[in-house]
């Protein structure tokens, strides 16, 4: 791995690098665990494992919302390494994120499942080929309700049959898939959260007990 720069506005050490894959070089984001800033409300484990957990769950559910992610050794120790996504700079990210597209709706559902507390506009990555990915999933899976997102346009809408099937699969695969990446208490909370989503049958609404939108939203 060859580190080429650092994103100075990131709250944790976030490095731009290239990794050799066969005879090719792939651009990646590298976040060493040693560079993670301690968080009072996420005291256990590390953010890198949570990022890996979101990737594994997204792939298992067939959503493909998270770029390829692994945890591996790098120049500054063990850390998360994620494929770099070239975004389409011509797109209006606010207009896209506030729209009704199925891809954005999938992201809103996924955030409700993983209890994402940091879905900002800047954490949504649209490409010129029409794909939409999400990044920065380190603050997810908390056992307490902490959903904060800019994707509230689907609040209270009923789940489709496809979305119910996604939730049912998430409930089935998550405990085995994510064991060791998040805490046992967080795994139990994840299953309970999915059960509640299935019981309600609709997208959650903003909580009165927790800020609904991350700040700043970009």
Language-model-derived ranges and their functions:
Residues 1-117, 121-122, 128-135:
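Conserved ATP-binding subdomain of kinase catalytic cores across diverse folds
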Residues 6, 20, 43, 127-218:
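C-terminal catalytic region of ATP-dependent kinase domains
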